[in-house]
Swiss-Prot record:
PROSITE patterns: ABC_TRANSPORTER_1, ABC_TRANSPORTER_2, LOLD. The gene is lolD. It holds the Pfam family ABC_tran. This is Lipoprotein-releasing system ATP-binding protein LolD. It is found in: Cell inner membrane. It comes from Syntrophotalea carbinolica (strain DSM 2380 / NBRC 103641 / GraBd1) (Pelobacter carbinolicus).
Length: 227
């Protein structure tokens, strides 16, 4: 699909669960569209539903009701391993806490999704090396997470998220655990990757500076989009 055309369409999305005898609404009748290549920030207080929305759009959780369409296809209609295959081919994820495996090197951490996808070891290693160079860590390939700074760990996590060449990158508070200077460098990196790779970015953040630099800011409160 060409850049600028509607890629993700969310209609009347609801998510709730039962706690004791009470129903808790996490998301209430959310509607939104995201264009291919768009950079969207989602902001709001803790508990507003930001991360729940990201998890459902990313196919990590299912809605109680409503539709999530990618290029007009309802991803939750995919059967068997179809949703997993779609997610692995199309989506990448970065989280506040990088979730790198501490016993693996930076190179091995980035290789891992490719190996799980049954790439040859040589192909996975080549792709991981290229991505780590792209994020500025060409001299840190053999370092383990404990030997890297917080910003370097997050760069490894970003490289790992991109190893399958996703179209959409979801990031949940990617700078939330970093100081202001390191946060700025991660923002610049995401912006550069957006341009060079044509990524669609969906970023959950409390960082007002990061949000202001994106194409659109979506405000959430009490499970609803408020602006």
């Amino acid at each position: 699909m060409s850049r600028g055309a509607a890629m993700i369409e969310v209609t009347n999305l609801c998510k709730s669960f039962v706690s004791g005898t009470r129903r808790v609404d996490v998301l209430s009748h959310v509607d939104m569209k995201i264009d291919a290549g768009e950079r969207v920030a989602v902001v709001g207080a803790s508990g507003a539903g930001k991360t729940s929305l990201m998890h459902i759009l990313g196919g990590l959780d299912r809605p109680t009701s409503g539709d999530v369409l990618y290029d007009k296809q309802d991803i939750f209609s995919l059967k068997g391993a179809g949703l997993d295959d779609f997610r692995n081919r199309t989506l990448g994820f970065v989280f506040q806490f990088h979730q790198l495996l501490p016993e693996f090197t930076a190179l091995e951490n980035v290789m891992l999704p490719a190996l799980i996808a049954r790439w040859s070891r040589a192909k996975a290693k080549s792709a991981a090396r290229e991505l780590l160079t792209e994020v500025g860590l060409e001299s840190r390939l053999s370092h383990k997470p404990g030997e890297l700074s917080g910003g370097e760990q997050q760069r490894v996590a970003i490289a790992r998220a991109l190893v399958g060449s996703p179209r959409v990158l979801f990031a949940d508070e990617p700078t939330g655990n970093l100081d202001s200077n390191t946060s700025e460098s991660i923002y610049r990196l995401l912006s550069r990757l957006h341009e060079t790779r044509g990524l669609t970015l969906f970023i959950v953040t409390h960082d007002a500076r990061l949000a202001a630099g994106l194409d659109r800011v979506v405000h959430m409160a009490d499970g609803r989009i408020t602006g």
